[in-house]
UniProtKB/Swiss-Prot annotation:
<feature type="transmembrane region" description="Helical">
    <location>
        <begin position="63"/>
        <end position="83"/>
    </location>
</feature>
<keyword id="KW-1278">Translocase</keyword>
<keyword id="KW-0472">Membrane</keyword>
<comment type="subunit">
    <text>NDH-1 is composed of 14 different subunits. Subunits NuoA, H, J, K, L, M, N constitute the membrane sector of the complex.</text>
</comment>
<dbReference type="GO" id="GO:0048038">
    <property type="term" value="F:quinone binding"/>
</dbReference>
<comment type="similarity">
    <text>Belongs to the complex I subunit 3 family.</text>
</comment>
<keyword id="KW-0813">Transport</keyword>
<dbReference type="InterPro" id="IPR023043">
    <property type="entry name" value="NAD(P)H_OxRDtase_bac/plastid"/>
</dbReference>
<protein>
    <recommendedName>
        <fullName>NADH-quinone oxidoreductase subunit A</fullName>
        <ecNumber>7.1.1.-</ecNumber>
    </recommendedName>
</protein>
<feature type="transmembrane region" description="Helical">
    <location>
        <begin position="8"/>
        <end position="28"/>
    </location>
</feature>
<keyword id="KW-0520">NAD</keyword>
<dbReference type="GO" id="GO:0030964">
    <property type="term" value="C:NADH dehydrogenase complex"/>
</dbReference>
<comment type="function">
    <text>NDH-1 shuttles electrons from NADH, via FMN and iron-sulfur (Fe-S) centers, to quinones in the respiratory chain. The immediate electron acceptor for the enzyme in this species is believed to be a menaquinone. Couples the redox reaction to proton translocation (for every two electrons transferred, four hydrogen ions are translocated across the cytoplasmic membrane), and thus conserves the redox energy in a proton gradient.</text>
</comment>
<dbReference type="InterPro" id="IPR000440">
    <property type="entry name" value="NADH_UbQ/plastoQ_OxRdtase_su3"/>
</dbReference>
<keyword id="KW-1133">Transmembrane helix</keyword>
<keyword id="KW-0812">Transmembrane</keyword>
<feature type="transmembrane region" description="Helical">
    <location>
        <begin position="93"/>
        <end position="113"/>
    </location>
</feature>
C-alpha cells in the first residue's frame, strides 16, 4: 500500500507542479506586459495591406471527416504501441482483445466507406425530368380563360 501511495504521490506532485508552472507563466506575462489597446492595434493586418473581405473561410466538411478518421486511427496506434512492447507475457487473451479493438475500428471505417463519407467527389443523383404534359383539347363552345 505504501509503495502505491508513493507512486501516485509522485504523479500528483508532477501534475501539481505542471499546473503551477502554467498558471505562474500566465499570471507573470499578464502582469508584466504592457496593455495599451487602440483602434490601430486592434485592426486586421495582412502584410501591410488593408484587409479585403472576412477572415472567416468556409472549409468543406469532407476535410473534417478525413481529419476525424486520421485522429481515430492515430489514437489507435498510440494504444497499440504499449501493447506491442508487452505482448509476449500477456498471452493469447491480450491478442484477442487487441484484435477486437482493431476490428471495431475497422468496422467503423467500413461503415463510413459504405455510407459514402470517404468519397471525395460525390456523385450527383440523376433525377429524370418529366416530359411536358400534352395540352388537352378544348370542347366546342367552352370558353378559354387567359
Amino acid at each position: 500500500m505504501d509503495q502505491t501511495l508513493t507512486q501516485f504521490g509522485s504523479v500528483f506532485v508532477f501534475l501539481l507542479l505542471g499546473v503551477i508552472f502554467v498558471v505562474g507563466g500566465y499570471l507573470t506575462s499578464r502582469l508584466l506586459r504592457p496593455s495599451r489597446p487602440n483602434p490601430q492595434k486592434n485592426s486586421t493586418y495582412e502584410c501591410g495591406e488593408e484587409a479585403i473581405g472576412s477572415a472567416w473561410v468556409k472549409f468543406n466538411i469532407r476535410f473534417y471527416v478525413v481529419a476525424l478518421i486520421f485522429i481515430i486511427f492515430d489514437v489507435e496506434v498510440v494504444f497499440l504501441y504499449p501493447w506491442a512492447t508487452v505482448f509476449k507475457p500477456l498471452g493469447t487473451f491480450a491478442l484477442i482483445e487487441v484484435l477486437v479493438f482493431a476490428g471495431i475500428l475497422i468496422l467503423g471505417l467500413a461503415y463510413a466507406w459504405v455510407k459514402g463519407d470517404l468519397d471525395w467527389v460525390r456523385p450527383t443523383p440523376n433525377i429524370p425530368k418529366m416530359p411536358p404534359m400534352p395540352e388537352l383539347p378544348v370542347a366546342k363552345g367552352a370558353s378559354q380563360k387567359d
